[in-house]
């Protein structure tokens, strides 16, 4: 992991911990989660890593190996308005978590994505990776569904992306060699193991050469169009 190497060179010490959140793929279910449908997916062995240490003064200082500009803010005084950069995902996470729990400890380190941005729920991965680290340094334990909903709220209410809960659910609930089957209406789910009779397989993900950000795309418009189509079908 390059983030660990950079961390050691920058801070001349071993990190307190290295947080990780995987990316996910969705065989079936695009634009179904925000319409409360049933979807499936699985996490992969690539994702977001973050090498970090505690900051008792409550400051978050995180440069990214993938984006310019360092994220820097107090966990107890997150700006009300988003700043329009990648660090909005971190600010939104701290703000949503801080509405339920008292945050006193910040963190400093290096964050890194192992694949190009876009298409594999990298935004949700960044949020959950940071959320798990922020919880750890503040002694907070979140149950899986609370972690999923906190991460979703960061994107919905702060970043401004009207996503559903599939990305977060897949990244939190997935298990190796299992397929996640999730009903986004009642949050019930099943982890379906690979059948012993199934032939060996590999999942391939191809990069188109284009990077994207949902907050700068027509994602929210797609959600509105899905709702309009549902209303039309219902008569």
Predicted segments with their positions:
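FAD-binding core of FAD-dependent oxidoreductases
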Residues: 26, 33-36, 43-44, 86, ...
């Amino acid at each position: 992991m390059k983030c660990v190497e950079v961390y050691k060179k920058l801070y001349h010490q071993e990190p307190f911990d290295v947080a990780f959140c995987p990316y996910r793929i969705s065989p079936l279910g695009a634009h179904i989660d925000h319409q409360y449908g049933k979807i499936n997916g699985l996490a992969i062995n690539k994702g977001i890593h973050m090498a970090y240490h505690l900051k008792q003064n409550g400051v978050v200082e995180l440069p990214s190996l993938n984006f310019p500009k360092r994220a820097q803010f107090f966990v107890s005084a997150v700006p009300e308005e988003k700043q329009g950069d990648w660090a909005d995902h971190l600010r939104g996470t701290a703000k949503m978590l801080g509405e339920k729990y008292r945050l006193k400890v910040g963190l400093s380190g290096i964050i890194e994505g192992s694949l190009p941005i876009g298409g594999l729920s990298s935004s949700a991965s960044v949020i959950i990776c940071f959320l798990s680290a922020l919880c750890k340094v503040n002694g907070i334990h979140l149950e899986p569904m609370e972690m999923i909903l906190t991460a979703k709220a960061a994107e919905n209410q702060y970043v401004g992306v009207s996503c559903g809960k599939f990305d977060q659910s897949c990244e939190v609930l997935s298990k190796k060699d299992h397929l996640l089957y999730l009903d986004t209406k009642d949050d019930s789910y099943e982890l379906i193991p690979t059948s012993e009779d199934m032939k060996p397989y590999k999942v391939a993900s191809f990069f188109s050469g284009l990077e994207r950000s949902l907050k700068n795309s027509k994602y929210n418009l797609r959600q509105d169009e899905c709702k309009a189509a549902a209303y039309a079908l219902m008569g």
